[in-house]
């Protein structure tokens, strides 16, 4: 598996190539959990249990591997961009890892084509829309070819059209590149069709996990309020007796 979190409150595994949607009420700990999966962003404090990355304790994974293999996209498009040119932003992570120039050029070209960035490749980052900036963040992370891509409410500051386009690109990444995706997202109607697995949190604990269909059934059986927040198609499916 790509990730395994072990503990009395949170037993969860993310297999390679999975698309996991993590959901739950506001303040239940989703962002805190995601940051535990990226040590450079993890909050300070005492952690119980274990987090494994490719069957190795996460704290024993060297920083270079963490930087390259664990991608993270934050909520605000502004918080992650560090250069002033689109092309340089695509190359920055690879430069920081000491990647050779021919490889940087090849990967940047591949990402520009994959994400449709060619038309604004040489533009200033300041000229981009919020949707373009977030797409650039995503492309910059993917240039390092991560094994897992973690996204914390990446569309929260995007307009509906840009958000739909962004989520469609995530589905393409998962299908065509086989990258595991762990996503928290409030637009569940659009995120759930992409999911191979769903995990629901409540008050810092894992409430239930499984396929979208299984989670719908579990929430209905539990009578939990999160059932009403699920996409309409899931609620209808879970309510039909079999």
Predicted ranges, named:
Residues 46-56:
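Conserved ABC transporter NBD signature motif
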Residues 102-120:
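Conserved ABC ATPase "signature" region
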Residues 57-71:
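ABC ATPase NBD coupling module
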Residues 149-152:
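Catalytic Walker B motif of ABC-type/P-loop ATPase nucleotide-binding domains
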């Amino acid at each position: 598996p790509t990730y395994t979190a072990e503990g009395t409150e949170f037993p969860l595994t993310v297999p390679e190539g999975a698309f996991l949607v993590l959901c739950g009420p506001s303040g239940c700990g989703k962002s805190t959990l995601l940051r535990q999966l990226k040590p450079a962003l993890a909050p300070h404090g005492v952690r119980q249990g274990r987090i494994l990355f490719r069957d190795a304790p996460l704290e024993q994974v060297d920083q270079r591997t963490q930087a390259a293999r664990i991608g993270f996209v934050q909520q605000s498009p502004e918080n992650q961009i560090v250069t002033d040119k689109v092309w340089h932003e695509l190359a920055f992570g690879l430069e920081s890892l000491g990647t050779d120039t021919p490889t940087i050029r090849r990967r940047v070209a591949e990402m520009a084509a994959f994400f449709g960035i060619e038309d604004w490749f040489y533009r200033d980052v300041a000229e981009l829309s919020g949707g373009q900036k977030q797409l650039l963040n995503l492309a910059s992370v993917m240039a390092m070819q991560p094994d897992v891509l973690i996204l914390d409410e990446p569309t929260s500051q995007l307009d509906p059209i840009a958000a739909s386009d962004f989520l469609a690109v995530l589905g393409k990444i998962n299908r065509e590149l086989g990258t595991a995706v762990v996503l928290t997202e409030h637009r569940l109607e659009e995120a759930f069709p992409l999911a191979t697995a769903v995990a629901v949190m409540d008050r810092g604990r894992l409430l239930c996990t499984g396929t979208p269909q299984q989670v719908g059934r579990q929430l209905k059986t539990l009578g939990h309020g999160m059932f009403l927040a699920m996409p309409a198609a899931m609620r209808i499916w879970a309510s039909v007796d079999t």
